[in-house]
Amino acid sequence: MASSKFVLFAILALSLLLSGTEARKTVWPSSELDPKCCSNQPEFGICDSKEDDERCAQMCLDGCPTNKGGGCQPITEAPGAVCSCYCA
């Protein structure tokens, strides 16, 4: 009787844990990365507000299989900031 309750509890707990997981592609270091990964994205345009920073982070999450996000980063080559997708 006690073991059947334990099994039922274990299955319920496992189901709850797995229901919140999100599938993302895994990229191994030796594999080829998408061009958006680890680079500046000048085609993003102006990147100078919090909304732009959030939009940049989402674009990098959606477009780069490393799933590290991104943000508006100042660069020396141009005034202002540019969207940059993170590597690590």
Curated annotation (Swiss-Prot):
Which N-terminal residues, if any, form the signal peptide? 1-23
What are the subcellular locations of this protein? Secreted
- Which keywords are on file for this protein? Antimicrobial, Disulfide bond, Fungicide, Plant defense, Secreted, Signal
Disulfide links within the chain: 37-87, 47-72, 56-83, 60-85
What transmembrane ranges does the database entry give?
A: none
Keyword Disulfide bond listed? The answer is: yes
- Disulfide bond as a keyword? yes
* Gene Ontology cellular-component terms listed: extracellular region
Gene Ontology biological process terms from the UniProt entry? defense response to fungus; killing of cells of another organism
Query: Can you say what this protein is called?
Result: Defensin-like protein 24
Organism of origin = Arabidopsis thaliana (Mouse-ear cress)
**What does the record give as the organism's lineage?**
Eukaryota, Viridiplantae, Streptophyta, Embryophyta, Tracheophyta
